[in-house]
Amino acid sequence: MALSWTMDKLGPIARSAEDCALVLQAIHGPDGKDASVVPATFDWAGVGDWHSLRIGYLKSEFNPLQPLKLDEPAAGETPEKKKDREKRNAEQTASHARRAYDQRYDLAALDKLRAMGVQLIPVQLPKLPYGAMTNLLTAEGAAAFDDLTLSGRDKLLTAQGPEDWPNLFRTARFYPAVEYIQANRARTLAVQQVSALFNEVDIIVTATTGMQLVATNLTGHPALIVPNGLRGAAAPSPPKIDDGENDDIGGPGTPVSLTFLAGHYQDAQLAAFGHAYQQATGFHKLHPKLD
């Protein structure tokens, strides 16, 4: 289903980068039904030796995490506001603990790449207000589901919290037009400046989480997310959710991932490098226990 017409993208999900490349080879390119599709080439077999690629890494994503700052109670906080704040703080605490644990896998990936002969080049994401641009996604999503909101059928959705889609769609109607236009102007700068990074390198290695996730959603640069191991027994347990059950995020035995980014329409280079990493690690062959 559509959520954001200028940010939605289709891509294969498969066991390996090679399988993804084979599927993308079959589905890429215009079909005459979508005027936004560019007739870019995808020559998986013609990439050549991946050793000739310049490989960068987002240095800030591999630095030690900063201490977590939780929201403090506001003056005159109501019980409902307190509940929301405590829930938000609990989610942030769980996310921070999981990220701190997972970082060992990211650092090990850099070591593995160096062992493969990769000369890693440190790069930085351009300093732009990516977080302020996320309202573009919400506004487009609200437009895509406007009939649902106006009909009142959005009340049938079970998740009705402040940050759940029904309420985000409702509040999107109050976005000032000036702020929406300014966010689009900032997005144009993001496309230009992130694209400029790929004048320096061909591939960027980064953690799967972090601001790059927001940035590449806005700029449309291709991303390949590959398995990067399984969490050990000491991994933080998933947090509880509203119904008292454990969330399905993280926990011992669950997989971690790593992200590779490339310039626009350089998906074939991306797949070739991801394939090389998987050949050297074998993480794509692991299976988490399902009992």
Report residues per predicted region.
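Acidic helix-start/capping segments at beta-turn-to-alpha-helix junctions
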Residues: 125-137
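Short amphipathic alpha-helical coupling segments at ligand-binding clamshell hinges
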Residues: 19-23, 105, 179, 183, ...
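Hydrophobic/aromatic ligand-binding patch that stacks against planar heteroaromatic rings
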Residues: 112, 214-217
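Short helix-loop capping/hinge segments that flank enzyme active sites or metal/cofactor-binding pockets
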Residues: 52-93, 121, 135-191, 233-258
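Short, well-ordered beta-strand elements
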Residues: 12, 246-249, 254-266, 270-278, ...
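Short, Asp-centered acidic motifs that coordinate Mg2+ and/or phosphate
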Residues: 202-204
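Short glycine/serine-rich loop segments
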Residues: 1-27, 207, 217-230, 254-259
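A short helix-breaking turn/cap at a secondary-structure junction
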Residues: 1-101, 279-291
